[in-house]
Amino acid sequence: MGDETRIYHGRWRNAEYGEEYYAEVALATLPRDRWGALGLYPEGSTQLGKLEGWVWSAPVTLPAEGCRVVLNAEHPELMRVEISDAGFNLLPGYSDSNSGTPQKGSLDCAVACPSGDLAALGGKQVRIRVHMQRDGASDPRLFAIYLRSDS
């Protein structure tokens, strides 16, 4: 609902109910799409405490009219976004020095690309790669990637 995920839960037993049985319903709220996250291994991990890493999306077909990439993330300033074709071949206009960088935010971090929007890739199947880099005590977390139409 809006910027929240609401989870209603209650007490339930798979048994006969006696006179002393009672039930309660509770509500847990989380920021939108924050049920799980992708991040880097913890810094203290034996060999896996890497300072950087990345994650690839499944192939997606971009809307013909173009769209924007928006991240739901913690510490989005420690991330950058690249676009490849469905075969993992990075696209020159959307990778390396042309990577998109998320603007400050949290639930809706718009990604600014030097090459502009993704209208040139409309109707094509692509993958999105999100790079993450740890910076001191700041640990980036990616919760969701959205493709938003400007219309």
Predicted ranges, named:
Residues 39-66, 78-80, 108-116, 137-143:
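Short beta-strands within extracellular/lumenal beta-sheet-rich domains
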Residues 29-31, 83-87, 147-149:
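Residue-level signal for short segments within beta-strands and strand-turn junctions
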Residues 32, 133-151:
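Exposed low-complexity, polar/acidic, P/S/T/G-rich flexible segments that act as propeptides
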Residues 11-12, 129-136:
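Short beta-strand-plus-loop segments that form exposed binding edges in beta-rich domains
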Residues 1-56, 78:
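Catalytic cores of secreted or luminal carbohydrate-active enzymes
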Residues 91-121:
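Extracellular carbohydrate recognition and processing domains
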Residues 63-76, 126-132:
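A short beta-strand element within beta-rich, extracytoplasmic domains
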Residues 68-90:
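Beta-strand-rich binding/interaction modules
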